[in-house]
Amino acid sequence: MPIPQDQIDPDAAKVVRRLARSGFAAYLVGGCVRDLLLGRKPKDFEVATSATPPEIKALFRNCRIIGRRFRLAHIFFGQKIIETSTFRANPREVEPPEDDDAPLDALQGHGDNELYIRRDNVFGSAEEDARRRDFTINGLFYDLDGDQVIDDVEGLPDLERRTVRTIGDPDVRFREDPIRIRRALKFSARLNF
């Protein structure tokens, strides 16, 4: 499934290429990759990178860091924003360092009174980041310079089958965020899956 280069937003391409020239891994990610593969015009473009929010800000003077728990970089091109996030690992799979004094956000579990500890800014690899996403069709990365789709979550076969499928156990994923049920229905209807 090739992605036509002329359909890629030039400002998103600038962000990816500047990050790459500075030594960071950087890819288009998520809905824009899905839409391009389906021959649809993406409503926006997102970038995922190995650069941390401060490293992103140092490269782009038109950048603003947003979010408290989940830090993102918004890179402005006029009225357009290219949302740029750092690859993240699943916080439950990462052991915090023993000397880490950073505060943890404690969240009450839903229904079973379990206490969940969530550290949303645990940085990871591109593969770990893909596995954190909601659906396989949104977990696709696109390497601009290599002109290849990176699929660590079996999203390409699901696109071909026109299937919306969670990454991981659906019961767990929907309990983590019940809004995902609505998103699955929305994608299914909007994409005619």
Question: Residue ranges of each PLM-predicted region?
Answer:
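Catalytic cores of the polymerase beta-like nucleotidyltransferase superfamily
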Residues: 1-193
